[in-house]
Amino acid sequence: MSQISAREDSQSHAARDHWIAERLFDWSGLPTVHLRPTFFSEWLLFPYVRSTIVENGIIDLPYGNGRHAPIAGEDQARVIATILAEPAAHIGKTYTLCGPTELNQAGIAAAITEVLGRKISYQPQTIPQYRECLEKAGYPEFMIQHLCAVAIDYQNGLFSGEDKFIAKLTGKPPMTVQDFVASHRQAFATTSAAGR
């Protein structure tokens, strides 16, 4: 499991490390399949992201008008299980894993709004503002460097794409943002709603 932004010239040290790990597997001669997912749907549950949704009704990430089709962990697990069941046809291949519908952050906020029945908005930050928030939250520098670098990649379209593989391989389309939020509704409950 790598990531969609893995490449030799990545400004993210972590994404470059993923690219290096892919090359090591390729050079090893071991039968390998590389999976490069875009941002997971679970990113919405990441403490910093989730807390701004729950507490403030906003997504405040520095992603500009970039787009991606969030991919749920359980959809990735189905892909992995299917490949492991019959690996021969997949050895040596690299697959990009995306959800079914590409959205910008305003579209993701609208999808969350649709499910939760309360207004969620996208309020983009600058990269320096984002870095400051992550530092205040106590994230390690390696992670902050990665998240800020991939935010620029996101703005530049590196995370874009829609599923052309999962439904065909597994026989089931990947979850939409709405499906994911509905299945994790309790995680997005406000304090007042959770206390009822």
What do these predicted regions represent?
Residues M1:
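N-terminal Rossmann-like NAD(P)+-binding domain of SDR-like oxidoreductases, especially those catalyzing
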Residues I4-S121, Q125, E132-A137, F142-M143, ...:
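Oxidoreductase cofactor-interface core, primarily capturing Rossmann-like NAD(P)-dependent enzymes
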